[in-house]
A protein has these predicted regions:
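Aromatic-lined substrate-binding rim segments of carbohydrate-active enzymes
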Residues: 75-144, 217-222
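Catalytic-core region of carbohydrate-active enzymes that cleave or remodel glycosidic bonds
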Residues: 120-123, 127, 218-228, 243-247, ...
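Active-site neighborhood of glycoside hydrolase catalytic domains
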Residues: 163-239
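Fungal secretory targeting signals
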Residues: 1-20
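The substrate-binding groove and active-site-proximal loops of carbohydrate-active enzymes
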Residues: 59-72, 96-115, 150-170, 189, ...
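Aromatic- and acidic-residue-enriched segments that line the glycan-binding/catalytic groove
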Residues: 105-113, 124, 135-162, 166, ...
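Non-catalytic C-terminal accessory domains or segments of carbohydrate-active enzymes
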Residues: 338, 344-912, 916, 922-964
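N-terminal carbohydrate-binding accessory modules
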Residues: 18-90
């Protein structure tokens, strides 16, 4: 539809822990007296309405992305470009302290834990950063980001206890200095810094502990942080808000979880035994985004962070007990970086509209109302009014959970008076879980939309015309009016009516079924300004508009050439709208591409697109080898190198007083990750018939018990139980005989430490209590168990694999020996497969070489390992650890679930060469266990313009002389 030569309106049809900062109708404004705040720099400033970046008022549309959950630095740019393509301009990120200071005093942020590649990728994509290093982060990671050795700190965590503060100093000094170098003042992408995280309540006085918060702030400032400090209260309680004195930040914000998840909200975490992330996504999907994201924007939110935008993976034991390996989160970008979820496209519509609507930052939010702007009280409308720059009205169902359709009309104030809309008659429609932005007096280039009920994706001022992309739901009637008279021309396929007058032109149309979701196909890449991907401005920068690709990563103009980086998942026609004057050549992914120019001035082309047939190896056909990974129960086993459990007291307040003669808590001996084994010795009285054992490993953990080589039984796990007391029947023992008790258990991470004072993170992992006795001999003393020893990851906090970090390896025999690394010593193994399994309880480690030959230079082909779970209910329970090239990338629990598919990113997997696959099988009952099926799967290939992915070449097997 062409209006005169000045407006080109393209009609299209479209169809959750987060940070919400600066809501202008909440009790706490961004800052009470911003003009009186002493700034340490002048590039990032603010007032009571928004941030300014280099003097430009900016709405920050942000998504959460944790680099530690994607240990392939060459993939950071891929994720950043996908976020930038949505119209977002910022990313928030946590740093996991536990990964960079596994041993007290030894800070290591190199290799895959280095932040410099993350900062570089953000800059290359044109994305600003909000840094959130804690020291406490929550984030559904083990200990909430606290390293396990903090269990030995006597002082209360997240307070001004001197030993706790001292423990944080090394980390905060080092990580603060790294982030400081990446601040915008040094040419980097970091524009905001958050000290601490969700510090919102406590079970200990005083609260808030202002001395503690000020200490964390001082740590950041001493490290060189000069950008504004922000807060994220768990709820709008005002903790640390500007004007509250010691411990106050510059900018106050709070979390918002509309659906009540502990998980503003881009998805949800999912616990062991949960429903799976695809089900989480259904609850917090594109419809959720339409309603709740727009509601936040209508409230005047101007720093808006979606948690998560990309979740990633809890690889290498980094997760907490209430979450499994996947941290997909039901986010807009899948764990494997695929962007086929509709929420991705819906958020793109919203963010792109905000980017071309800087006037919304000058508007004043009003209260949600019924019966004011619409006579239908089933519709609530929230106004955002401005005397200068346009008005915004967000319409939603009064009952936001309503799923049926509601018809309504509106009465909206305009510069020509209050108008009843649609003026041509008819009804607007709210279809199910939906909300809409209606605008009045909205500027588009040199023109003004008097009003529009259709939503706006973007607009662009061109030479001699202005392009506006509008959209509405299938079958919906919409109407817009342009101020000033102009001629109307439209294509014959457009179903519309219009009316002209001396003051305006009114256009009404109905979105048709053949245009369903076509708005999702539009991309608005920001044109580089010089070498800067940030473009000409933050709000409404110079762009072009591209229609038709799976993804448009970037666009630039050099001389006469328009260059576009795009990805394709199918053959398509590509349309380029807004090629600059003087441009005559089109390059797509580095190839000059011919095009046809339409009557409207757009370019149409058909890029060369083809897709390979992906052939993956059958994992059953690999040359598998196996080794017993529980030699500890054999009579000949030598445990002389084990750590003696000889602490008769503990500094852990959550485990005090001890119920055992010596501490059997893993962290008391430096074992903070993965499986642990315990061995104790006793002389039998001959009448023992019960072993009562109390263990603690976090929700869904398991434990198995042997006396010598006799299997007593297992606790196979429960999704709700972090600690359990199990009574095991003991077979007849020979009086005077010496026996060895062996306990194998897994730790699924430390608890988070959300409430200061509870010290939940210090809940110990290990054996809490035991009693070996005769149940029929009342009052008799239990049999003493002595000479306790404990085994965890080799070296404990002096962990062996510095490359893969302090959490990747647990304490099983194959892990201590390094057999999970590439090129293990197969001469020590025997031929066996996980599909055949074992006949009895125990642990077996299987390994095989996996060769791949995929066209990775041209195609992005996400891969995943899938365990067959079809017989999990009837089959014996087992647990499996999945290792890929030395990285632990899966914890499979057959009897609890829900995860059966484990994505492994390219870079961890070598898509063009040799890989080493490892699977440990822990059979939890006497019937043994086998893996019914394990397959390597792929998503459909995407023809990609991303940068080459570098293979993470970690250390291969080398004999560990101190292994046992």
């Amino acid at each position: 539809m062409k209006l005169s030569h000045t407006l080109l309106a393209t009609l299209a049809t479209p169809v959750a822990q987060g940070l919400t900062l600066g809501s202008r109708n909440q009790a706490y404004s961004i800052i009470r007296e911003p003009a009186k705040k002493e700034l340490l720099q002048d590039l990032i400033t603010w007032d009571d309405k928004s941030l300014f970046i280099r003097g430009e008022r900016a709405l920050m549309y942000s998504g959460e992305f944790h680099p530690f959950r994607l240990p392939v630095p060459s993939l950071y740019l891929d994720v950043f470009q996908k976020i930038r393509a949505m119209g977002f301009n910022m990313v928030s990120f946590y740093v996991d302290w536990a990964l960079v200071e596994g041993k007290p005093g030894e800070f290591r942020a190199d290799g895959i834990f280095s932040l410099e590649p993350f900062f570089k990728a953000a800059t290359e994509a044109g994305v600003y950063l909000l840094a959130r290093p804690g020291p406490y982060i929550n984030a559904e990671v083990s200990g909430g980001g606290y390293p396990g050795w903090l269990q030995r700190i006597k002082g209360i965590l997240r307070t001004d206890a001197p030993d706790y503060l001292k423990a944080t100093d090394n980390y905060m000094a080092n990580i603060g200095a790294i982030i400081a170098k990446a601040q915008i003042t040094n040419g980097g992408p970091v524009i905001l810094f958050q000290p601490e995280n969700e510090y919102s309540g406590a079970s200990v006085s005083p609260f808030p502990n202002k001395k503690y918060m000020q200490y964390v702030i001082d740590q950041a400032r001493k490290a060189g942080i000069v950008v504004p400090l922000i807060d994220n209260d768990s709820y709008p309680g005002g903790t640390g808000a500007p004007g509250t004195g010691e411990g106050e930040v510059d900018i106050y914000g709070f979390d918002s979880y509309p659906l009540g998840f502990d998980c503003f909200q881009g998805g949800s975490y999912d616990p062991f035994g949960g429903y799976g992330y695809d089900q989480c996504y259904k609850l917090v999907n594109h419809e959720f985004s339409r309603v709740f994201d727009k509601n936040n924007l209508a409230a005047g939110v101007n720093i808006f962070n979606i948690y998560m935008i990309f979740g990633g993976t809890n690889w290498g034991n980094l997760g907490h007990p209430n979450g499994y390996t996947s941290y997909d989160y039901g986010a807009s970008i899948r764990e494997d970086r695929y962007i086929d979820r509709e929420k991705y496209s819906q958020m793109k519509l919203e963010a792109q509209f905000m980017r071309v609507s800087p006037s919304i930052l000058e508007a004043t939010p009003g209260d949600p109302s019924t019966g004011v702007y619409s006579e239908n009280k089933d519709v609530t409308i929230t106004p955002m009014l401005s005397n200068k720059t346009g008005n915004f009205f967000v319409a939603r169902h009064t009952d936001y959970q309503r799923r049926d359709s509601t018809s309504y009309t509106v009465k909206l104030p305009t510069s020509l008076g209050t108008l009843s809309i649609p003026q041509f008659g008819g009804q607007l429609t709210l279809s199910g879980r939906d909300s809409k932005f209606h605008v009045t007096d909205y500027p588009v280039g040199n023109h003004t939309l008097l009003y529009s009920t259709a939503e706006i994706l973007t607009w662009k001022k061109l030479d001699g015309q202005t392009v506006v992309i509008m959209y509405g739901g299938q079958g919906e009637l919409h109407e817009f009016a342009l101020q000033n008279a102009m001629d109307v021309h439209h294509s014959s396929s457009s179903q519309l009516s219009y009316k002209q007058s001396n003051s305006s032109v009114i256009v009404q149309f109905t979105a048709t079924s053949e245009h369903r979701n076509s708005a999702y196909n539009y991309w608005v890449p920001v044109l580089h300004k010089g070498n800067s991907a940030y473009g000409s401005s933050v709000m409404n920068p110079e762009t072009i508009i591209v229609n038709g690709a799976y993804l448009v990563r970037s666009a630039s103009v050099g001389g006469k050439t328009v260059s576009i980086q795009a990805d394709f998942n199918q053959t398509t026609t590509l349309e380029v709208i807004g090629a600059p004057k003087g441009a005559s050549e089109l390059s797509i992914n580095g190839k000059i591409t011919s095009y046809k120019k339409t009557n409207e001035g757009t370019w149409l082309c058909n890029p060369e697109i083809s897709f390979p047939t992906v052939k993956l190896p059958n994992l059953r056909s690999l040359d598998w080898h196996a080794i017993d990974s529980l030699p500890e129960i054999k009579p000949s086993y030598d445990d002389s190198r084990w750590t003696k459990a000889n602490h008769t007291t503990t500094t852990n307040p959550k485990g005090t007083p001890l119920k055992t003669p010596v501490s059997l808590y893993g962290s008391d001996y430096g074992f903070n990750t993965g499986n642990m084994l315990f061995r104790g010795s006793f002389v039998a009285a001959g009448n023992e018939d019960q072993l009562v054992l109390t263990t603690s490993g976090g929700q869904a953990y398991a434990a198995s018990v042997w006396i010598n080589q006799t299997f007593l039984g297992s606790f196979a796990g429960n999704k709700n139980w972090a600690t359990v007391i199990v009574t095991h029947a003991v077979p007849q023992l020979r009086a005077g005989g010496r026996y060895t008790l062996t306990v194998v258990m897994d730790s699924l991470g430390f608890n988070e430490n959300l409430t200061p004072g509870n010290d939940d993170m210090k809940a110990p992992r290990g054996i809490l209590d035991y009693k070996l006795h005769s149940s029929s001999s009342a009052g008799s003393d239990p049999t003493p168990i002595t000479d306790w020893k404990i085994a965890g990851n080799l070296g404990g906090e002096d962990y062996k694999d510095k490359f893969r970090g302090p959490l990747n390896e647990g304490g099983l025999f194959f892990e201590r020996s390094g057999f999970h690394q590439p090129l293990p010593p197969l001469d020590l193994f025997s031929k066996a497969t996980p599909f055949d399994g074992t006949a009895g309880a125990g642990i077996t480690y299987y390994t095989a070489k996996l060769d791949l030959d995929l066209p990775a230079d041209e195609y992005d082909i996400p891969l995943a390992f899938r365990f067959d779970n079809s017989s999990a209910i009837a089959a014996p329970a087992y647990r499996a650890l999945l290792y890929v090239n030395g990285f632990q990338y899966g914890k499979y629990i057959s009897n609890i679930g829900p995860q059966t598919e484990f994505p492994v990113p390219e870079g961890i997997l070598n898509h063009n060469g040799e890989n080493w696959l490892g699977v440990s099988v822990w059979a939890l009952d006497s019937n043994g266990a086998k893996v019914p099926g394990l397959t390597l799967t792929s998503r459909p290939p995407v023809l990609t313009s991303r940068n080459k992915v570098d293979f993470i070449q970690g250390p291969s097997y080398s004999k560990r002389d101190d292994a046992f």
